[in-house]
Swiss-Prot record:
Catalytically driven reaction(s): isopentenyl diphosphate + 2 oxidized [2Fe-2S]-[ferredoxin] + H2O = (2E)-4-hydroxy-3-methylbut-2-enyl diphosphate + 2 reduced [2Fe-2S]-[ferredoxin] + 2 H(+); dimethylallyl diphosphate + 2 oxidized [2Fe-2S]-[ferredoxin] + H2O = (2E)-4-hydroxy-3-methylbut-2-enyl diphosphate + 2 reduced [2Fe-2S]-[ferredoxin] + 2 H(+)
Family the entry assigns: Belongs to the IspH family.
Annotated function: Catalyzes the conversion of 1-hydroxy-2-methyl-2-(E)-butenyl 4-diphosphate (HMBPP) into a mixture of isopentenyl diphosphate (IPP) and dimethylallyl diphosphate (DMAPP). Acts in the terminal step of the DOXP/MEP pathway for isoprenoid precursor biosynthesis.
The protein's name in its UniProt record: 4-hydroxy-3-methylbut-2-enyl diphosphate reductase
Binding positions ([4Fe-4S] cluster): C12, C96, C197
Annotated residues for binding of (2E)-4-hydroxy-3-methylbut-2-enyl diphosphate: H41, H74, H124, T167, S225, S226, N227, S269
GO biological process, one term: dimethylallyl diphosphate biosynthetic process
Cofactor: [4Fe-4S] cluster
Subunit note: Homodimer.
Length: 316
């Protein structure tokens, strides 16, 4: 059995930054550190940080006065931000800068009283945070997930209308929704630069290349990870058997025992150690040396807040 590795795969710059913020805060301030929502959607990462003293909460009311609070990489609404400001808390923001970019687009539309449409998945924390940047009652903020949603949508003023997208969507699906928006509302204005982030786009491109060669595709990522789910869906659409797994223990031998080529990739919130463990398990099942495919090089780095820029070795 041949093992192929998608490239790029795994951690993106926003996830790296968010995890570093929690790790550095723990090193500097000590446990406990409170984090609103899972800092990134990966069980291994969250469990590791929890063992070191991070406490993951959903409501600001769960955080005691005087504590350290970190917002997750997915971002928060203005209401959550204001609630935290009203408390005696030290707050650090791990929102991915590419999510913050979308927040700024929504806030700008809100200030102008222009209606905005967000393409995204209802209930996802990034969507809740982005929708929560809009506050102008003279305008309006709407969520759509599919072309059908677009055709059912009515707005107050089609002349002043903009759209944004969640950063972790399927590129192909989003293109279909944008096409519907432009047909339904010919004067709608989109972002100057695509809101779907570079890491989402690159990983979907990489899994497409992987699925062209592999019979079975294993996507390392947690079930609540939007970008990881999109990778598995894309491979399935290409006619391949694709499975979303948290780690190597999820692999079922019957998935791969007849396969001549198995592809492995990882969502943007999955650490490489999990990929290494998956490769090791596949090798136990008869796989050869893992061969990385060529792909786009990623060298983007997002800095942590200056108060947390410290070499953890100096703190230990």
């Amino acid at each position: 059995m041949q093992i192929l590795l998608a490239n790029p795969r795994g951690f993106c710059a926003g996830v790296d930054r968010a995890i570093s913020i929690v790790e550095n805060a723990l090193a500097i301030y000590g446990a406990p550190i409170y984090v609103r929502h899972e800092v990134v959607h990966n069980r291994y990462v969250v469990d590791s940080l929890r063992e070191r003293g991070a406490i993951f909460i959903e409501q600001i009311s769960e955080v005691p006065d005087g504590a350290i609070l970190i917002f997750s990489a997915h971002g928060v609404s203005q209401a959550v931000r204001n609630e935290a400001k009203s408390r005696d808390l030290t707050v650090f923001d791990a929102t991915c800068p590419l999510v913050t970019k979308v927040h700024m687009e929504v806030a700008r539309a809100s200030r102008r009283g222009e209606e905005s449409i967000l393409i995204g998945h209802a209930g996802h924390p990034e969507v809740e945070g982005t929708m929560g940047q809009y506050s102008n009652p003279e305008g309006g903020m709407y969520l759509v997930e599919s072309p059908d949603d677009v055709w059912k949508l009515t707005v107050k003023n089609e002349e002043k209308l903009s759209f944004m997208t969640q950063t972790t969507l399927s590129v192909d699906d989003t293109s279909d929704v944008i096409d519907a928006l432009r047909k339904r509302f010919p004067k709608i204005v989109g972002p100057r630069k695509d809101d779907i982030c570079y890491a989402t786009t690159n990983r979907q491109e990489a899994v497409r290349a992987l699925a062209e060669q592999a019979e079975v595709v294993l996507v390392v990522g947690s079930k609540n990870s939007s970008n990881s789910n999109r990778l598995a869906e894309l491979a399935q659409r290409m006619g391949k058997r694709a499975f979303l797994i948290d780690d190597a223990t999820d692999i079922q031998e019957e998935w791969v025992k007849e396969a001549k080529c198995v592809g492995v990739t990882a969502g943007a919130s999955a650490p490489d150690i999990l990929v290494q463990n998956v490769v090791a398990r596949l090798q136990q099942l008869g796989g050869g040396e893992a061969i990385p495919l060529e792909g786009r090089e990623e060298n983007i780095v997002f800095e942590v807040p200056k108060e947390l820029r410290v070499d953890i070795r100096e703190v230990d």
